[in-house]
Amino acid sequence: MMRKAKAFMSLSTFYKYAKIFDNQTNRKLFKAKPKIGIRATKPKEIIHADVCVYRPLDYTKCFIYFIVDNFSRMILGWKISTEYKSSIMLENLRNVYCKYIFEKEKPPAILMVDDGIENKGLVCEAIENKEIKVDRWVAQKDVIFSNSMVEAVNKQMKYNFLFRHQLLDIEHTQRFLETAVELYNNRPHSALYGFTPVEVFNGAKPDKYFFKPQMEEAKMLRKAENKALSCDSCAFLLEKKE
């Protein structure tokens, strides 16, 4: 502009007039707020099914089938196999359905799955024939929500358990998962405010204010201890440091 002798002004003046004539140039960009996924109000209301892939030291491709309760984050059932097919998912689903008496749930539980082949075929037939009475929802197809709840559990099982150990083969991995799933289900979960998945599945109510009285008491005790420290003790610590 100045080189063509059209106008002469400082950079700040240029931006001033640019803002006047086009208010789009100074528009702030904001990141989209994270969306809250689908949430159940009680155990056995929504369950999620998914498969994750893991390779032990012999490089066998292992498929781990998980079924997770939405409300409690508890792993209700799992299977491991070198095959990726709906019959294994159906077997896992049947075991969970019978073990936790889903038949008595009114209305029927929602089964959230992705559009993978392991969730079609025999699984769809069993649901259509009322052998397994659940409502099957395909994530981001039948509903806008993703299947992130069980995907998060897959990630935790990989990074908190599987990837931290040298597992030789699929048999070794299966034995390890028997312990790992038990540990996961009985370990306090951050989303449950200190409760474990098993406790919440069995009736405990997650409450973020549950430990508030103890936290306030601990805070007051820390303040009292800090005030009780004399200047002499502080000076002693400083001299010792020097």
Each language-model region and where it sits:
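A periodicity- and composition-biased signal for non-globular, repetitive helical segments
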Residues: 22-25, 30-33, 37, 85, ...
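Short linear capping/connector segments at secondary-structure termini
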Residues: 32-33, 109, 197-198
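Basic, flexible linker segments flanking DNA-binding modules
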Residues: 1-46, 125, 143, 202-205
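Acidic/polar loop patches that form or flank catalytic/metal-binding clefts of enzymes
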Residues: 27, 107-108, 192-193
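C-terminal domain-tail junction helix/linker
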Residues: 130, 156-242
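RNase H-like DDE/DDD metal-dependent nuclease/strand-transfer catalytic core used by mobile genetic elements
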Residues: 8-11, 36-64, 70-183
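Sequence-pattern detector for short linear motifs
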Residues: 19, 30, 42, 82, ...
